[in-house]
Amino acid sequence: MERYLPVSKKRNSSSSLEKITGSANGNGTLYSEEDTNLEENDFSWGDYLEETGTRAVPHVSFRHVEISIRSNFQPGMKLEVANKNNPDTYWVATIITTCGQLLLLRYCGYGEDRRADFWCDVIIADLHPVGWCTQNNKVLRPPDAIKDKYSDWTDFLIRELTGSRTAPANLLEGPLRGKGPIDLITVDSLIELQDSQNPFQYWIVSVTENVGGRLRLRYVGLEHTESYDRWLFYLDYRLRPIGWCQENKYRMDPPSDLYYLKLPFEWKCALEKALVLAAESPLPMEVFKDHADLQSHFFTVGMRLETLHISDPFHIYPASVTKVFNSKFFQVAIDDLRPEADKPTMLCHADSLGILPVQWCLKNGVNLAPPKGYSGQDFNWVDYHKQRQAEEAPHFCFKNAFSRGFSKNMKLEAVNPVNPGEVCVATVVSVKGRLLWLHLEGLETPMPDIIVDMDSMDIFPVGWCEANSYPLTTPYKASSKSKRKTVHFKMEKQLLSPVPIEKIPHELCLLPPQMDSPVGAINAKYCCPQLFVNHRCFSGPFLNKGRISELPQSVGPGMCVLVLKEILTLITNAAYKPGRVLRELQLVEDPEWNSQEEILKAKYGGKTYRAVVKIVRTADQVMNFCRQVCAKLECCPNLLSPVLISETCPENCSVHTKTRYTYYYGKRRRVIQSSLRVSNIETPPKSTRRRKRRKSVYVQKRRKSAIVVPAGVPAGVPAGVPEDIPAGIPEGIPASIPESIPEGIPESLPEAIPESIPKGSAQKTEQEKRETLDTARKKTGYHGPAYQTDTSAAQVPFARPRRAVTLRRNSEALKRPPVERARRVRTVPTTASSNNRVKGPLVRIVKPEDSSQSDEEKLILESNPLEWSVTDVVRFIKLTDCAPLARIFQEQDIDGQALLLLTLPTVQECMELKLGPAIKLCHQIERVKVAFYAQYAS
C-alpha cells in the first residue's frame, strides 16, 4: 500500500534565503553579530563548511540536477542567425555549447576556427530555424570575413546541412522560446502518474509547485486536499505526458487506496475536466526528452534479494520477487515470516534504487535486518535458503555500482523521508557501494540515519534550495559555535558621482545590454556562462597578482548569483586587504540591474569582514557587472570575463605596474614620472596642503605584526634609517600611494625625518658621509648597521605614517653621478636585456681597503631605484642571497618605487614569507634604501 506523507509548511525562521540587508535605517549600516543573535536566521553554507571543516559533495555527483539545467538546444544543431555586420542578411550557424538561454554559435564556413565564436541570447537574438530565410524571402549571405573562402556557397550549404540536426522551430519562436525543460512545467500543468503498485494503471495529477524540477503533485479530483500530495522530480519514470495511458491501452483509474474518497461519478467528472484542460494547453514534449528508457530485467518469481523499502529508509531487509508484470516491471515484497502478515511491496524495474544482491550487506559490513518472525538471533542467508528453498537473484540482474564523488563527512541537501516537503542540511555518514548513510541536521525530532541511493532524486547539491528560493532546514546555531568577532562596514550616506566605464566591444562575446524580464521569469534566464579569471591581465592596486595566479582558471557555468558570488569571494581573498575590496564592491550597483543582495565574507588578520553586495541575477547583465567590478578595483576590464585570454590582452594592460599607471576604467590617476625624466619640464608648484586623512573603517586590531623601532627614533622612520636624512624625496615617488597597498607599506616616506644633510651632500667624500651616518646613530641611540633590519623583541604598535608634503628637490642634483674614489671596486655582473629600461649594471659593491674583514661591503647605485622597472628589480634580487624570491617580485609586479616602500611587516604579510627569509630580504632592501638616501635624496 502506498504511503502518503503530510507536507510541511515552509519554515520562515531558519530559511537560508533570509538575508541581512543592513538597510533598515536607510544608510546601509551593518551591525555586529556580537550584539544580535542572528545565527539561526543567517545560515551560510560557506561559513558552515568552514566551521565544520567539511566539504560539499561535487555538483556533478547529482546527475538529475545536472540534466535539469540543460538547454533544449543541443550542440551541433543548425539554425539561421543574422549577420553581425549586416543585420538584413542571415547565415547558417552551428550551436557549439549552451548555458541556459545563452548559445555559443559559430558561423558555418569557419571550420574549427574558434576566433569568431559568439554568444547570443535566445530570447532577444534574431534566430530562426533552417529554411526560414527561403520561406520569408530573406538573403542568405556568408560573413565578410569568409566570403572568399568558397566559390560555390550553395554547394557548401547542401553538404553542411545534409544529415545535420536543425533547431526545432517551437524553441525559436512562440511561448517556448528560450525555455529549459523545467521552465516549461508551470503551475496547473497536467501529467499522468503511474500507480505505485500497478504499472498498467495511471491517473492525472496537477502540478501545484515546481521547485527546480521537483514537483509537488495533486491528484485530479482532490484539488482541495493537501494530505495526499506527492513530491517527485520531473525525471521520474512514473511521470508521462497526457495521452500516454490511452496510447498504450492502460487503465485510467485513481489509486485504489484513494478511490473511497470520492464517488465514482465524481472521479469521472474530474477526469473529463482534466482531459479538456490538457487538450487546451498541453505540456510540451520537450519536458520528457531526458527521461531514461527502462531496460529489460531478468528477475523471476521467487528470487531472493536484499532491498531498501521506500517507506522505511532506515534498514535493509531480505526480500523476494513475488510477481513479474512484463519485461520491464516486477514486484518485490519484504519478507515476513509471520502468518497472515501484510507484506510491504513495491513496484520495481531493472534500474530501481535500493535493490541489492544477496550477501551485499555481509560483503559491505552492513547490518541486514532479519525478517519479522525470524526465530534466530543473527540472520544467515545459507540457513534461510535451506528453510525457504529459494534461489538468489544473479548479480547481473542488478545495476553496477560506481563512485560518484561521495565520501564520508561531505555535506549536501536531502529530503526528509518522513516529511517530503522539507529539505534539510545533510551529512554523509558512510558510503557503501552505491548506498549513502545520511544524517539530517536541524530536525525538531531526532531521526536515525537514512539510507539513500547515489542516484536518488531526493538529494541535492549544496546551495540548491537557495538557488530555487526554497527554505532549507538548517542546524540550530549552525553559523557560530561560539561568539566570533566580525568587522562590518558602516557606509556613510553620501552622494557618489557615477563611475565612468569605458565599454569596449568584444567580438568574441556579444551579450545583450538589457532584457525585459516578465513576471515568472524562466530559470534558464538566470544561468551564467563560464567566467574566466585572466591572471595575465593587470590586477590593479587592490589585488595580489601572485594570489590571483593561484586561483582557478574559471568558475561556472551555473546560476548567476552562485557563480558571481563564488568568483567575487575568490577575488576578495586574493586581495592585499580583503576589507578594502569588500568596501569597493559595496559600491558596485546600477538601478537598472535585476539584482539581489548577498553577503560576502573574508578573513584577514584573525578577523572576519563581511559586506552586503548587490549581485545581478540575469545572464544578460553579467558582462556589465564584471566590468563594473573591474572598474571599482582599478584592474584590467578583462580580469573577470566570459572570454579566456591566453596570450595578449586586447586592452594592452601589460604596460601597467603597481606604481606606474595613467588611466583605469572608472578612476583617473596622475601620471607618475621620475624626476630624472622631468627635470627639464617646468611644473607649477605643488600645494603643500595635506590631504585630509580618510577615517578608518576598521576596529582596533590585534598586534599581529609590529615594527621594531630603536629608542629615540621618531614614529614612522624605518628602522636603521638615520634621522639626519632629508624629509624630501624625489618626484618619482607619488604623493599618494593607492589606498589598497597593504598595511605596512607607507603612503609616502615619513616627513618626520629632519633635514640635516645639505643639498650638496652628493659631492661629499665617502668619509664625510660615514661620519654623518655615525652622527645619526648617536642621536637615536642606535649603534647597529645603518641598513640592518632590527628584529629584537622590543615592539611598538604600528602607526600609519603621515603623508609627506615636501616632495620636490632640485632635480639637477639627481643627475650628478657619485664621485669616484680610489678603492677596490667590484662591479656586479648583470644580464643584458633589450627590454630593461635601466641599461648596464644596477649596483656596484665596494669594500674600503682600510676596513676590517668583518665589515659588510657597501652598495653603490649605478642608477636611481625610482626608475627601476620590474625586470630591473628582479635582476637586483637575483644578484643577492635572496635570488629564490625573485619570482615573487615578478609575479607581484614590484618595481623600484614599490621596492623602496617595502617593510618587514609588509614582506611577511603580502609575500607570505617566514621571519627568517623576510629578514634576509629586508636586509637587502635596506641596503638599497640607505644607498638611495645617500646618493639621490638630496
Swiss-Prot record:
Key word Nucleus present: yes
Listed PANTHER family: POLYCOMB GROUP PROTEIN, SCM-LIKE WITH FOUR MBT DOMAINS PROTEIN 2
PROSITE patterns according to UniProt: MBT
Protein name: Scm-like with four MBT domains protein 2
GO biological-process terms attached to the record: negative regulation of gene expression
Disordered: region residues: 1-32, 742-836
Protein localization: Nucleus
MBT-type repeats, residues: 43-143, 151-255, 265-371, 379-475
Recorded name of the encoding gene: Sfmbt2
Annotated Gene3D superfamilies: 2.30.30.140, SLED domain, Transcription Factor, Ets-1
Expression tissues: Expressed in testis and, at much lower levels, in ovary.
Keywords: Nucleus, Repeat, Repressor
Subunit structure: Interacts with YY1. Interacts with methylated histones H3K9me2 and H4K20me2.
